[in-house]
Structures are given as structure tokens and as C-alpha cells.
Amino acid sequence: MGNNPSALKRARQNLKRNLRNVSVKSELKTIEKRCMSLIREGKKEEALEFFKFVSKKLDTAARKRIIHRNKAARKKSNLSILLLR
């Protein structure tokens, strides 16, 4: 780690951003698992409503560059394929 003020500030910012990104990624994993479980249980209407919520969260994370936009698209595609079966 650097010793000048700007390097110290960057280190603080990186730590704060890392904590926020880890939190968002964890939330994404949790809601994806919940959507998968709704699909597996056969609750199509609930799963469809929840898919819209998951889709919105994935797009937001991609827009903020927490995850790559292609990853968000892939996750949404896989969930929608499972939902339509």
C-alpha cells in the first residue's frame, strides 16, 4: 500500500467498494437460488413474478459493473429457459 494521501484514500475506497460488491453478489446468488427453487417446486406464477425481480437485480448489478453484462444476460437466459419448460 502506498504512503501518500491519495494512495491511502484509494485503499479506503477500494475496501468500501469491495464490501459493497461482495454484499450485492451474495444477494444475487441468494435470489437466483430462490427463483430456481420456485421453478423446481412447480410454482410457475410465483416463479414468473420473482424472475422479473431477479432480472431487474441482475441488470442493475451489470449496469453498476458489479458483474459483467454478459454474465447477467446468461443468468437471465438460463432462468427463462428453465421457467418455460
Swiss-Prot record:
Which keywords accompany this UniProt record?
Ribonucleoprotein, Ribosomal protein, RNA-binding, rRNA-binding
Residue ranges the record marks as coiled coil = none
In Pfam terms, one family for this protein is Ribosomal_S20p
A GO cellular component annotated for this chain's UniProt record is: cytosol
Q: Please, which domain of life does this record's source organism belong to?
A: Bacteria
GO MF = small ribosomal subunit rRNA binding; structural constituent of ribosome
GO BP of this protein: translation
Q: Which residues cross the membrane?
A: none
Give the family from UniProt: Belongs to the bacterial ribosomal protein bS20 family.
> What NCBIfam families does the record point to?
S20
Explain the purpose of this protein. Binds directly to 16S ribosomal RNA.
The identity of this protein, by name, is: Small ribosomal subunit protein bS20
User: What gene name does this entry carry?
Assistant: rpsT
